[in-house]
Amino acid sequence: MADGFSLNDALAGSGNPNPQGWPGAWGNQPGAGGYPGASYPGAYPGQAPPGGYPGQAPPSAYPGPTGPSAYPGPTAPGAYPGPTAPGAFPGQPGGPGAYPSAPGAYPSAPGAYPATGPFGAPTGPLTVPYDMPLPGGVMPRMLITIIGTVKPNANSITLNFKKGNDIAFHFNPRFNENNRRVIVCNTKQDNNWGREERQSAFPFESGKPFKIQVLVEADHFKVAVNDVHLLQYNHRMKNLREISQLGIIGDITLTSASHAMI
């Protein structure tokens, strides 16, 4: 299921090759236009343009309010999972527009978390098993973010996107299945499991923090772990609006679980 991937792949079928709120490429690849934060071509942040008054900084230079996509500063609303400011959480919603670019600062915004954990999330933990409501179901451009730490000697992690008793998307990293590490994806309808899809790439480590991000698209889910694209799972249940809950279980300490539209 894992394969080569690009920004155009991530946005396939959206009708917009570069929609607002998606400044970075999927999988933490730098976007077009050079390294984020290049305020003046070739100039060190804060350096005046040719002919400027000594010490005068060009617009959007550092320090001071940054322009769109300038570094440091927050990402655009809902950006996933492109580069962010120091201490900021990749992909968390930022305010529309620029903020003063104090290194490590992250402006408060609805749904945002303070940057206190290893991925900029608050220190939990939340109780596992944990059920997160998805009011109105899931829909294209919805981004679900789960942050936590794998317990030592872990056996498995499970995410279940549920429609009543059915499971639209079962994401199940297994740390020791016949002495192998594998990720199993599946769907359960009318109490019957479908055909398993297995993934050998395994980015989780016992005792280590992780960030899982699930992006809902019109015909599939995309999953990235620690800002790297992992797999794609085609929808087997077509009525996405009926997928109204995410269940999180397994051998983890859960720090946060959130969703946002991008």
Swiss-Prot record:
Any one GO cellular component localisation term in the record: external side of plasma membrane
Record flagged with keyword DNA repair: no
Ranges of Low complexity composition bias in the record: 37-46, 67-91
Pro residues bias (residue ranges): 47-66
Domain Galectin intervals: 130-260
One Pfam family it belongs to: Gal-bind_lectin
GO biological process, one term: neutrophil chemotaxis
Modified residues (N-acetylalanine): 2
Superkingdom, natural source: Eukaryota
Quaternary state and interactors: Probably forms homo- or heterodimers. Interacts with DMBT1. Interacts with CD6 and ALCAM. Forms a complex with the ITGA3, ITGB1 and CSPG4. Interacts with LGALS3BP, LYPD3, ZFTRAF1 and UACA. Interacts with TRIM16; this interaction mediates autophagy of damage endomembranes. Interacts with and inhibits by binding NCR3/NKp30.
Name of the protein: Galectin-3
The organism of origin for this protein: Rattus norvegicus
Lineage, opening ranks: Eukaryota, Metazoa, Chordata, Craniata, Vertebrata
